[in-house]
Amino acid sequence: MAERGVERGGDRGDFGRGFGGRGGGRGGPRGRGRRAGRAPEEEKWVPVTKLGRLVKEGKITKIEQIYLHSLPVKEYQIIDLLVGPSLKDEVMKIMPVQKQTRAGQRTRFKAFIVVGDSNGHVGLGVKCSKEVATAIRGAIILAKLSVVPIRRGYWGNKIGKPHTVPCKVTGKCGSVTVRMVPAPRGSGIVAARVPKKVLQFAGIDDVFTSSRGSTKTLGNFVKATFDCLQKTYGFLTPEFWKETRFSKSPYQEHTDFLLIPPGVKISEVVVDKSVE
């Protein structure tokens, strides 16, 4: 019996194979079949909207061209291409929410995500899902789709780059009201933790803020701050009083390209026309 025990697991003080004998030791390749050791493949983006096709083909190179003509963005890959790797995201809060059903309480997770490039573009996404990872992934996509331009200005003399909000602005959501006041250069962002992070992502360096209402409700606090930043482009100041020269919409400018069905190469269309 003693010899058999030695064969199986060595001496009594040693560790035998136990239940982990199949894996080939710690740190070895795990899993079996097709999925073991395969690198994740990147999905190739196939645009389904006119705007997506124009962006992928390089007809639109700046995100300001989209804002100028108020074109709706339906694909988050458009923002990824135009803004690029400078776009950062941060989870502001993940909170459980419940719904009463016949079977009992159904719990889901709500994620608040802020994205921005710290250069005048910021977005907010809110998503509810059964799993935390799914909620975060969905909120990031919604935040990218809601990216808006933020107008920046000066406190006094127009020296250097814009560093603060152009004027006093107020945003509201629920009972929460956020007010922003221009600040002199070097003042920094005088704000609570939640709006401070949003303002950093928007690229504002100096601002005074005040808030009132139930700021403990983080969701409304973030939305009020985002609403405040959106309103920076909601009015005309003297520098915008000049006569506007209207330009063609990208859809009008690139009509010939958009008439070609997606998936058909331009060279094939040219050959067909020459045959006719």
From Swiss-Prot:
GO terms for cellular component: cytosol; cytosolic small ribosomal subunit; plasmodesma. Pfam families: Ribosomal_S5, Ribosomal_S5_C. It comes from the Eukaryota. GO terms for biological process: translation. Residues 1-42 are annotated as: Disordered. The keyword Ribosomal protein applies. Residues 16-28 have a biased composition (Gly residues). Residues 87-150 form the S5 DRBM domain. Keywords: Ribonucleoprotein, Ribosomal protein. Residues 1-15 have a biased composition (Basic and acidic residues). One of its GO terms (molecular function) is structural constituent of ribosome. PROSITE patterns: RIBOSOMAL_S5, S5_DSRBD. Belongs to the universal ribosomal protein uS5 family. This is Small ribosomal subunit protein uS5w. It comes from Arabidopsis thaliana (Mouse-ear cress). The gene is RPS2D.
